[in-house]
Amino acid sequence: FSVSLPEAGSYYFHMSSIGKIPARRKVSVSAQSPVWNVGKLYMKDDARTLGEVRVSAQRPLVKVDIDKLVYNLEEDPEAKVSNTLDMLRKVPMVTVDGDDNIQLKGNSNFKIYMNGRPSGLLSSNPSAVLKSLPASSIKDIEVITDPGARYDAEGVSGIINIIMVRRVLDGYTGTVSAEVTANEAYGGGTFVSLKAGKLGLTANYNLEYEREPIADITSFRENLSDDANRYLSQIGEHWEREKMHRGYLEGTFEIDSMNLISVDANLFRKRQKEFSDLSVEMRDMNRDLIYAYDRFSQNQPVFGSVEVNANYQHETRRKGELLTLSYRFTNDPNDDENRMRITGTSNYSDFLQWDTNRAKTNEHTGQLDYIRPIAGGHDLETGVKYILRQTDSEITQRLYDETSGNWHEPSGSFVDFSHTQHIYSVYLGGTFRWNKLGIKAGVRAEGTSLDVSYSNDLTKDFHSNFVDIVPNVTLSYSIGQSQQIRLGYNMRIQRAGIDYLNPYVDERDPLNVSYGNPDLDSEKSNSVNLNYTLFTQKFNINASVSHAFVNNSIEQYTFMDTERPNVSVSTYGNIGKRHQTGFSLYMNWSPVPLFRFFMNGGVDYISMENEERNLSNSGWSGRAFAGVQFSFPKDFRLNMNAGYMLPKIQLQGKRSDFLFHGITLNKDFFHKKLTFSVYCKSPLMKTWKMENKTYNNAFTLYETENKVMREFGISVSYRFGSLTDTFRKIKRGIVNDDVKDCGGKDVD
């Protein structure tokens, strides 16, 4: 490592280490390069021995840099028994709501990376993946609210970067874990890493099965424009079964001290079975029954990701100079199969329907990055990148013919859709430091070539090209050793993912249908962030104020079908002007070594408007999460927490508030190699009523679900192995953060 010195001259450095004799070294530096490259330090062993020392102080959980904030999961005892999704609730400026949707600064438009690179398994289903990922396998979670020019321009609110634990030392180490709950859910996993000479391997695998309890659901809609089909009611039950696999394999090889190669692969696969059984009634304005039927549906989505990364890193003899060449391939299948049975009970005919949607996204990415330090602790970075993204969807609808006993495809029901993007980008940026002042600035240019085609209807094909210039700048000022003020401006863009683009018509509910919009443009956002941080030995605080505005926001909207006036239709469009002003606050207080209190929350005022459809909405949204941690003798730990979220504002309504709490007790055995835990989520309430209200001048829709909250579980993990030496890791890699996804996974 190197040490930057204030001016030219001679200095004495005093060095000490436990078990070593203190040493002193004199060094001299010039005005042209006031930096001491430390190199190797040699210290003699101290023959004296120490008695047993018990360290009871707690390390800080949060630290800050010019453009980001870092939450250290390795130092949080609760991470040993929690999944990563639950731990995200404790990360400053991050929120997880009652439906497991993730938000950054109160906004769902952001990106999640793994180890500084985009990850296919996290781009399409982050909640599901993070819920299956043990928090004990995570080292840090970085919140990058002011991404620099090196990052893709997408991700309106910023980036959440998940850094995996790097237990890759000479020798081997591993962890095995298992968990079971009273709600018929179980899971387990293993982590192994080893190093032999210049070769290092890391592997991780997790399996999870969940059987969600039956939930009561209701839906009431009033159609203000159709007196004959005025009132629609649907009452019934919903339940799910799901099974998830997640695996990770990484290998590194040190060619020499200057060159490093790494290859890694990620695998995620989730198979669900969703069931709903509903009684449906339609009544006129006088509340007389028009028709009624029972609807049973079984939906089987299968989705996941296969991802392969290859990186070559070259370091020069200039400290910090780095050249990285990276390639990435991802395959993200997203299949869906739905079978629906309608049984008429009054003025309605029986029928069976079978829909399939075979969708996938393949992506090839190549990237070259170069960073060069310059005198005075500054550095410059530049790079180029190319992405080929191919999205396909094949849609088939079948109806059952009672007379022939065969399935047949209605005319026009088959759709073969293809969406191809070529994205070219180049960037230039720099980081500059002068004593207490730091500046990070850059500019990125992205060109996009877009082709959309329909094999069964060539008249719908289209092609477009466009270029975006994206600037960014962040200023930071350090007040003493423990305080920092940061001001940043970012322009970001967001491209629509397959869930937004897919024209597949979801008719699981024939009276409330939905589909994507392949004509969506990328949305552009401008944001300003002001951040203050104070860190002391016992008290930490991070406060931020931000404002963001988008003039062509991608929003979901609902309307009544003009050809079928009893059917509501939901789709997406660049229809929204969105302004969001927010305040976020994080506090951590440790008055004594064995106790910690934390609080993470924020409040936002959101305003949305669409003049063309005469739609608008505004209001306050907020969230709060707080808890305490106790560390007792004999390696016992107790964690208690609670959270509350205000209703979420939408263009045509709002979603209900949400309350939850939990308690966890941990005990370590055998020198902290074995950890046993018991926990309970929301022990004081069995269910919570989730509500969703959607409305405009033509209709009002009110939906509810009684979500089961109470859950008891136990988990156990065991750590084994021995390690003696570290090996190097690739410092930079590919980051694709340009796709906006939804479809039940972080819906905005």
Where are these regions (language model features)?
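Short, acidic, small-residue-rich periplasmic hinge/interaction motif at the N-terminus
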Residues: 14-20, 34-77, 97-99, 105-109, ...
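Outer-membrane beta-barrel translocator/receptor signature
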Residues: 153-160, 168-217, 241-246
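A short, solvent-exposed loop/turn motif at the edges and junctions
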Residues: 6-28
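Surface-exposed extracellular loop regions of Gram-negative outer-membrane beta-barrel proteins
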Residues: 158-176, 215, 233, 244-250, 449-451, 481-526, 547-565, 683-697, ...
